[in-house]
């Protein structure tokens, strides 16, 4: 990667922009998209669904959507719902978490034309479903309802057959205002559990068995709600590689793995390339670190230079120049962060240092634009700022 960062540093210094930038390596992104495309070519049991919060830029979403031939999206933040509906004529949106009922009512009151949009609202309890039912009655609309199920993550959602039957019965009783659209079971725990507690393969099979149990309830006890186009959503980037091999789901949500921030470094995703980087310019170069109140340390031998960079303290790890790291005692800063590099490092003011984000969803909203870097040229893509 050293050659990549050296070239990127030179190209950034020749560009007009000297602010901190969030860089997408276009070549690496293309490789990741090719990997996903190939997997879906053979995983004919699944349809891809893009997680908007993880790819929170309209141009990025359009690029990925076109490459994967999908207009299925998962939205976690309501202000991002309308832009998706407006920019994708065939948008199929599944909410990734239950929304407060006031937001649902506000959305349809402010955007009545969206009544005809393909939106699946996620419901986790009978109480929430009753709230949604009341809104649908007041507005004289029909809401598509997707039920959140607990497949082992234990973050809420239906966790018993009795609860599932209760929700399905309520939907069945109000066909004018509620339409059952499917299930959503997020299984991120599968790859996070220490092997000593449960192996990945075992945890995945257990989560799949739980999912199938709820599907069976629908098909066997509520046949009038069952049809071929129900959305059985699962996954997330961590378990992508498992679902494409075998899954009881027919709809797979993912996003982060395409950019591969460091939280998604795993054995199952090892073939994917990291392609999201923060580039920030060096403001000051000092021969060594000086600590306030400890001038006596200045007389000691120093093996590191001290740099002060533009910004800092992102959810990201410094990766270049080699050996770069925050100072242990000086403290972190979001304004001008001090970092150390080996004394032999050739670096000057206005050079860039590089960091690798741990998440994409936490970092993208902090930058007004994404900088798409391909063939030594840059494109600016607007990001979703909230």
Outline where the language-model segments fall.
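Active-site loop ensemble at the mouth of alpha/beta enzyme cores that anchors a bound cofactor
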Residues: 202, 238-309, 313-315, 319-323
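Active-site-proximal beta-alpha core segment in soluble small-molecule metabolic enzymes
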Residues: 48-193
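N-terminal glycine-rich anion-binding loops that anchor highly charged ligand groups
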Residues: 5-8, 28-59
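Generic N-terminal amphipathic, Lys/Arg-enriched alpha-helix
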Residues: 4-24
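C-terminal accessory subdomain/extension
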Residues: 286-386
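Conserved, mostly hydrophobic/aromatic
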Residues: 29, 53, 84, 147, ...
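Active-site loop/helix belt of alpha/beta enzymes
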Residues: 144, 150-270
């Amino acid at each position: 990667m050293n050659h990549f960062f050296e070239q990127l540093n030179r190209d950034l210094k020749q560009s007009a922009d000297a602010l901190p930038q969030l860089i997408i390596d276009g070549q690496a992104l293309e490789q990741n998209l090719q990997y996903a495309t190939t997997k879906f070519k053979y995983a004919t049991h699944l349809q891809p669904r893009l997680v908007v919060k993880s790819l929170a830029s309209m141009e990025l979403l359009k690029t990925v959507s076109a490459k994967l031939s999908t207009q299925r999206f998962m939205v976690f933040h309501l202000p991002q719902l309308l832009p998706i509906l407006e920019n994708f004529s065939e948008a199929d949106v599944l909410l990734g978490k239950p929304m407060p009922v006031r937001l649902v009512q506000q959305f349809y009151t402010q955007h009545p034309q969206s009544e005809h949009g393909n939106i699946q609202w996620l419901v986790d309890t009978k109480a929430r479903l009753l709230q949604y039912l009341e809104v649908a009655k007041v507005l004289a609309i029909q809401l598509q309802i997707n039920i959140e199920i607990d497949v082992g993550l234990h973050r809420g959602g239906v966790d018993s057959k009795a609860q599932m039957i209760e929700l399905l019965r309520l939907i069945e009783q109000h066909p004018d205002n509620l339409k059952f659209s499917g299930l959503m079971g997020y299984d991120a725990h599968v790859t996070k559990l220490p092997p000593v507690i449960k192996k990945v393969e075992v945890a995945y099979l257990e989560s799949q068995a739980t999912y199938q149990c709820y599907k069976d309830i629908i098909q066997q006890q509520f046949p009038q709600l069952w049809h071929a186009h129900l959305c059985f959503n699962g996954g997330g980037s961590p378990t992508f590689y498992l679902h494409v091999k075998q899954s009881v789901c027919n709809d797979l949500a993912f996003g982060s793995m395409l950019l591969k921030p460091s939280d998604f470094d795993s054995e199952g995703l090892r073939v994917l390339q990291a392609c999201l980087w923060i580039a920030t310019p060096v403001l000051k170069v000092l021969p060594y670190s000086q600590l306030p109140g400890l001038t006596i340390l200045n007389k000691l031998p120093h093996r590191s230079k001290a740099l002060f960079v533009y910004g800092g303290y992102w959810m990201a790890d410094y990766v270049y120049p080699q050996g770069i790291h925050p100072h242990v005692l000086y403290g972190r800063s979001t304004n001008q962060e001090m970092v150390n590099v080996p004394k032999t490092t050739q670096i000057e003011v206005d050079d860039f240092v590089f960091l690798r984000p741990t998440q994409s969803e936490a970092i993208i909203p902090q930058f007004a634009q994404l900088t798409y870097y391909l063939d030594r040229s840059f494109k600016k893509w607007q990001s979703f700022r909230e």
